[in-house]
Amino acid sequence: MSSAVDLRSDTVTQPTPAMRAAMATAPLGDDVFGGDPSVNALQDKIAALLGFEAALFVPTGTQSNLCAILSHCQRGDEYIVGQQQHCYRWEGGGAAVFGSVQPQPLNHAPDGTLPLADIEAAIKPDDAHFARTRLLALENTLGGKLLPMAYVEQATALARRHGLSRHLDGARLFNAAVAQAHSVRAELVEAPGSTSTSSVRTVSHAEVVAEARRIAQCFDSVSVCFSKGLGAPVGSALCGSREFIARAHRIRKMAGGGMRQAGLLAAAAAHALDHHIDRLADDHALARRLAEGLAGLEGVSVEAPHTNIVFVDLHGAARDKSAGLLPHLAAQGIQATGLYRLRFVTHLDVDAAGVDRAVAAIRGYFGG
């Protein structure tokens, strides 16, 4: 492993040797003609995994969300979304620019949810004065936070009662599934009358996939990113019904997302689904190690991580010194992002030694 410790994002990962081998030997065709066997296999694989009829391989998560919103909505429609969600805040206003679909952003509760009462209040009446509310978009995880399953069920049921479609930006869906599987295991172990002694046993692959599917099945469409924690170099998938994916396919073409011998990339994504889901638990453990290592440092508040993202807020004297922190870390081969609010993301190219180096460097800078 390189001596550099890059904690900026889980998008910085390099393909593993096994992933590179899968890419090198992937059978190829022309996906614009629908003839790339590796792309077709990946689309079938992720659709079946999450319980959908079909899926579409796209270059980016931004394009996946754009295809989803424009497939659910028409010009003059709107979608309800959170202020901090990627498809509102970080995607250049694409749905409004390209589709004349306006967002109706809502404030998040501290746990990342959109209050149910706020969602209901945002749904417009059938009146020519208003944009037509067509879609509820959620993100899980959001800023590394796992949305409670009960909330996901309630919010999507509310949307369904009002005739809204439901889309999940599941860029880190499998991080959510790993965290949820461990939470479900803990609840079972702690339940009255339980005789289980497996509270520390690693959850199985089947348990994680079951939780991913459980989350996904609350929605009409789901976007999954392969190039974050799963470690593939490029690509996302959009899952939904066959009719929905046919609409999304047309939008992908208009957005320039059709690729030719894309099986090289699809093979990397398929390898990640087979080999990199379970290891996400290691990233979560490293995030906890980082958070625990910074706990108690004066002027530093650390949010307990749900998954692989750690947020750190600086106060008082630590805040006054914040401008020099990232250069100090960079001089020691450690990269992160932020100023007064720092973000650290663990991934497959970071190990415990790297996390410990980062902790020591931060504590040393602040005199801890």
Where are these regions (language model features)?
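Conserved PLP-enzyme active-site core in the AAT-like
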Residues: 2-185, 205-350, 358-367
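Intrinsically disordered, low-complexity segments enriched in serine/proline and basic residues
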Residues: 185-189, 194-205
